[in-house]
Amino acid sequence: MSEDSDMEKAIKETSILEEYSINWTQKLGAGISGPVRVCVKKSTQERFALKILLDRPKARNEVRLHMMCATHPNIVQIIEVFANSVQFPHESSPRARLLIVMEMMEGGELFHRISQHRHFTEKQASQVTKQIALALQHCHLLNIAHRDLKPENLLFKDNSLDAPVKLCDFGFAKVDQGDLMTPQFTPYYVAPQVLEAQRRHQKEKSGIIPTSPTPYTYNKSCDLWSLGVIIYVMLCGYPPFYSKHHSRTIPKDMRKKIMTGSFEFPEEEWSQISEMAKDVVRKLLKVKPEERLTIEGVLDHPWLNSTEALDNVLPSAQLMMDKAVVAGIQQAHAEQLANMRIQDLKVSLKPLHSVNNPILRKRKLLGTKPKDGIYIHDHENGTEDSNVALEKLRDVIAQCILPQAGKGENEDEKLNEVMQEAWKYNRECKLLRDALQSFSWNGRGFTDKVDRLKLAEVVKQVIEEQTLPHEPQ
């Protein structure tokens, strides 16, 4: 029996509400396809995480690949999957969706955990790395590339000191057949061959170079590049590649650093970190995929198997906590991912009278709502204007927290520009209006010096308020 048919049999078509209570207002985090919520098993009162996807082939593929990988102790487990109709606000009728019940991860995201751990040691970083590598090895043995390895997708099971870390979110995962051509990435964690694939695609579309008979591809080695970046940040608190310029796309200076593998180990943070740790980073951040460590090479590396104490306290926790920008950087990454995902998610919806789905035709004729329909209030599928409004707010956060090219009027002008755009789309938001008054905003610019980190935090609160659902009907 095929894996596809096994998965189809595993998906329940009964209403999830028969077995679970769903808290529509409590969000655990935002995956690439929308917020993850809390649900409670009625028979046991056990809490689980609930992810909701539009029921499309891409979503079923995500579920299939995640199910294939989820038997590993360092990968978030799928408990069960429901296929139900769910109606969100601004939708005229229910839409078929997959409701994925997953194990609850109470310990939070990787970098949040580190920022709360004042004595995070190199040994602990090594142990976390080993768990991530074991999860990747399991995926790669199944010939699956995750393609979105980043700190937000690495969660701790609970708050105990020895809690396992687990990989989640298989929204970009693909079976690696040497044809992983769709550029999917988060800027700080993107491998050089992904950028090369993107560059060739753009040139071919523009007719600058002839379409090559054999497309430039990238594969599982990209996950290993991302692992190298994550290790680097875990050890020192900042990424090896960054740009001095805020941009909605990867700027030239950052692109050049990635393509040439240009990074350093600044003495201030790296002087107490072992040569073994630096060695594994160097070998993972090789520009040429064939020179990069394999996942087996990572697991065999002395740093992951050392008997040395490695009890030196890392600077990463203090840096992340003091700069208070981890959440803002993650939001900027999410925005970048959304922009790169636009082409993948464009959908043409047929009017109901012309749809060829026999179930929908039957429902139309009956003139009734589906028996298994779930009707809620939520902003995640809001109007185009509301999406643009959130996008403009995230631009403000990015401008506030990304490294600045310089000081003075130029940077102030850039902040004023992005704030004007955000203000244009969010004038009715009382929280933003009140906050901007305290920052001396006159509608066109800030008249006083702005504490950018405080502004980023306020705008983050505005976004959270804008995306909070109403009570369910």
From Swiss-Prot:
Keyword Isomerase found: no
Biological-process GO terms, alphabetical: negative regulation of TOR signaling; positive regulation of dendritic spine development; positive regulation of telomere maintenance; positive regulation of transcription by RNA polymerase II; protein autophosphorylation; Ras protein signal transduction; regulation of translation; stress-induced premature senescence
Gene Ontology annotations for the cellular component aspect, listed alphabetically: cytoplasm; cytosol; nucleoplasm; nucleus; protein-containing complex; septin cytoskeleton
Alphabetized InterPro entries for the sequence: CDPK_Ser/Thr_kinases, Kinase-like_dom_sf, MAPKAPK_C, Prot_kinase_dom, Ser/Thr_kinase_AS
Keyword Nucleus: yes
Modified residues (Phosphothreonine): T182
Stated consequence of mutating L337A: Constitutive active mutant. In a knockin model, mouse display increased amounts of head dips and open arm time on the maze, compared to littermate controls
Enzyme class, first EC level, given as a word: transferase
Subunit structure: Interacts with SQSTM1. Interacts with ERK3/MAPK6 and ERK4/MAPK4 (via FRIEDE motif); the interaction is direct. Interacts with YWHAE; the interaction prevents phosphorylation of HSP27/HSPB1 leading to disrupt F-actin polymerization.
Protein name: MAP kinase-activated protein kinase 5
Source organism: Mus musculus
Lineage start: Eukaryota, Metazoa, Chordata, Craniata, Vertebrata
